[in-house]
Amino acid sequence: MKKSFSILSIFTLLIFSNLTINSCGSREDTVSCFPNAPINVILNLNLPAYYSLNQVGGWKYIDEQSSGTRGLIVVRASSTTFKIYDRNAPHICPDTNTTLEVKDDISVVCPKDNAKWILLTGQPTAVANVPPKTYLSNYDANSNVLNIYY
């Protein structure tokens, strides 16, 4: 009786340990071959080049130094918040035609497989089941400067 109780206890412990380890793992937001590059961009939104980012819903491609391997898509989500997307498709490995593009000012599209996301939220709407990779930013409303980093 003690032996079967001991075996049952060990078996139960192993099952719960396995469930705990697997359920607490981090969710992958991109495919494993997604390029990892440092991001450090400062945008002065007072400059004419960034005029489109002064209105909610406005967006701009950023292809400056330290803006990733294919650049960024910066979207003004509200008067004080921005969405910063990597232009690499998050659901497939980098290849020809996997650079994300904005279409009709409302969606982000991957030309390779026509995966789509909502521009303002990053929510997937077709093909992909993960949002575009996003980056952190700080916005100083007094100086109208946006700092993007990773």
In which residue ranges do the predicted regions lie?
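Short cysteine clusters
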Residues: 24, 89, 110-113
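A generic structural motif
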Residues: 1, 24-25
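Short cysteine/histidine-rich metal-coordination sites, predominantly Zn2+-binding motifs
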Residues: 103-113, 124-137
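Non-catalytic accessory regions used for complex assembly or targeting
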Residues: 13-16
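Bacterial N-terminal signal peptides that target proteins for export
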Residues: 1-11
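N-terminal pre-ligand scaffold of iron-sulfur
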Residues: 27-105, 118-119, 133-150
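C-terminal motif of bacterial Sec signal peptides marking the signal peptidase cleavage site
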Residues: 18-23
